[in-house]
């Protein structure tokens, strides 16, 4: 993924264009596939259909949205056969109960909430994320690991600061060691639980969030969302403003699917 627009990352040098390098946002494998297809060769692709990271209930979302042709299947690894997320400490309230049984959860947030300091923060989502981290930390008991249990994905570094501030209030001992980072820096990583604060306060920010999208075989592929949804092994939790997110067909479809197959839950702090 890249931060530049298609125009900014375009390559105009003829010598590079001749060898298939047309845009710096295109990966090596995208260039190889395009080169082979333009040469009308079809026996160059091998598709991996088994994955050992995501529980099937989580993989179903990325599979339906981005990998329908590949039909991803679990290896299966032990955690992929578990019926429930499985926290050893009993739930204390309704949200704990949801965390104990649901694999994919969406919690709607309020618009803005940065106190006028920046449009790249959302205080409501920061409180939600910190509360979720504290709950999972408590319910995981002795099995909790800052390096393995939880990761938090956000689009803006300003939001990282706000979330850490809220975490220091709710789970001060673990706050510095839990990874909170942008989706670009989360590529290649995984955690048992991924919490994503989408932090969109305007239509313009929704455009930024979905900027790394392209169309393939009539389907819109959102690179950032794809990476986000495929980082979690056991549980995926998202929070964002549904009114703004509905402006994207991809996010509107995701929220509708969560309403149907996961858990769309309002929670006020």
Across the structure, where does each feature detected by a protein language model lie?
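Conserved helicase motor core of SF1/SF2 NTP-dependent helicases
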Residues: 1-269
